Amino acid sequence: MTSGERVPMLAAIPTTAEAGTPGFRFSARIGLAAPAGTPPAVMARLHQEITAALAVPEVRTQFLNQAMIPAPSESPDAFQKLMQSEVERLGALIRAAGIQPE
């Protein structure tokens, strides 16, 4: 598991930190994007509806059955900041490793 914690449905599999590689973390994220200039009220409504859908037990169970943990962001801005920080973090890693597109 490359996340910071074990996934409940795969509890026997240790995290990378538990397996001897502390500091390594990577989590896949699924989110929606909207065109630049989308009104904040529209973004807020989308966030509200998605958060509500992810709280429905049957929907949550479908995600969990695929080893995915629904974790809606606090707000559209929070998700955008998270994604920007991941681009910066992973970009630095790619540059440090000298990885080039082929």
Labelled PLM ranges:
Residues 1-102:
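Conserved, function-defining micro-sites of small-solute handling proteins
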